[in-house]
Amino acid sequence: MVDTASKTGFISQIIGPVVDVEFPGGELPTVYSAIVVGEGESSVTCEVQQLLGSNKVRAVSMTSTDGLKRGAAVVNTGAPITVPVGVPTLGRIFNVLGEPVDEMGPCEATAGLPIHRAAPAFTDLDTKPSVFETGIKVVDLLAPYKRGGKIGLFGGAGVGKTVLIMELINNIARAHGGVSVFGGVGERTREGNDLYAEMKESGVIDEKKLDNSKVALVYGQMNEPPGARMRVGLTALTMAEYFRDVNKQDVLLFIDNIFRFVQAGSEVSALLGRMPSAVGYQPTLATEMGVLQERITSTTEGSITSIQAVYVPADDLTDPAPATTFAHLDATTVLSRGLASKGIYPAVDPLDSTSTMLQPEIVGAEHYATAQNIKETLQRYKELQDIIAILGLDELSEEDRLTVARARKVERFLSQPFFVAEVFTGSPGKYVSLADSIDGFNRLLDGEFDDLPEQSFYLVGDINEAIEKAAKINAK
């Protein structure tokens, strides 16, 4: 433990979550050091943000400062906030300090890491772009994820974000032998609780044998002080880095919601008395975002692929928070309410979702050509929808009618039964390889299945299943 005698200071001022502490001369903690007020369960951990001079430091609290008094003793731990890492974290829920909050006893982890760490050196990076196969047709074909890349997930309430996230967690464990870390940053406590319950129900978290779980959860919800919401993303990232660097695994890191990370930084910045920048955001917005995002990458040992839910304030994409986030993204997955209302799940919008990986020199000529064909067909269908609504399908030319028929089949074939939704849909989940997806869509667009009913393409895996389903429909 720390030699507390020489490292103890006292609180000189408390303003909400900001605590000023005076230390003896020559014993000042460094910036980002953790300092602790009190002992046991009632202790409050703060992180040093500024050295004020006159032997005083200004720190931001990670928990509520209720009950703290001036003159209370403060211990300098001499290190940043350190959190447990490794397999014992799987299936558990932690707070920003790495303390379990799921009432399942202490975490058995033997290793711990500080949340403030340098990004990997250039020499350690794996710079060759490679596609990260998810087994989800619409994602792999039309907006593929980069291994070690950053993906923005856009979608309103109730369009299937949570189910898509759980399926990705399930598939990375199934196909890549990887694990996931979920960072709940400044969102609703109820949503965090629902996600945990759904993960247990779908088998992503195995309560009987926690080591078999596929995900660790780190929550810093809306009711937490801004310091906790600002740092919870780093706690989740630190846990993910251990799986990448030490266990040499592919890791999925979910951050929900990246906007709340910026929002918390803005609150802390104002509390520390910094001059605000554009739209009232912190002047250090780009730096804070860069420090987090640069640690999310592929190394020669393993990869961290990050999926970040992005809340866009007032739907304004030019707002500094989403605009700064976009600069770091390699792909965007946009969920559409229109598709969800048609019952097409995953409700990923094939025309709005984008990826920097969709280039012939990266994915290959055949994949690229197939993706472009799908998009052209769906775009043409979208253009014809107004005419169909006014005049009806019969007024279209023969060629346009064929395009519409194929587009409707493509739209349905982009849907897929998920493993984690088996409980609700009754259909067994399907993992579809990229090669099977390309083959199926090529044959569909070439007209090979023009005589099959469109419902045979709905909620199936590969093209052979669609053919079998059509045979059953015709037999009836």
From Swiss-Prot:
Top-tier EC class: translocase
Tell me which domain of life the UniProt entry assigns to the organism this sequence originates from. Answer: Eukaryota
- Compartmental location: Plastid, Chloroplast thylakoid membrane
Q: Which reaction does it catalyse?
A: ATP + H2O + 4 H(+)(in) = ADP + phosphate + 5 H(+)(out)
SMART domains in the record: AAA
Give any single GO term for biological process: proton motive force-driven mitochondrial ATP synthesis
Q: Principal localization?
A: plastid
Q: What is the membrane topology here?
A: Peripheral membrane protein
- What's a Gene Ontology MF term here? proton-transporting ATP synthase activity, rotational mechanism
Alphabetical keyword list: ATP synthesis, ATP-binding, CF(1), Chloroplast, Hydrogen ion transport, Ion transport, Membrane, Nucleotide-binding, Plastid, Thylakoid, Translocase, Transport
Q: Does the keyword Chloroplast apply?
A: yes
Q: Which family does it belong to?
A: Belongs to the ATPase alpha/beta chains family.
Write out the function statement from the record. Produces ATP from ADP in the presence of a proton gradient across the membrane. The catalytic sites are hosted primarily by the beta subunits.
**Which HAMAP family does this UniProt record tie to the protein?**
ATP_synth_beta_bact
Q: How does it assemble?
A: F-type ATPases have 2 components, CF(1) - the catalytic core - and CF(0) - the membrane proton channel. CF(1) has five subunits: alpha(3), beta(3), gamma(1), delta(1), epsilon(1). CF(0) has four main subunits: a(1), b(1), b'(1) and c(9-12).
The protein in question is named ATP synthase subunit beta, chloroplastic
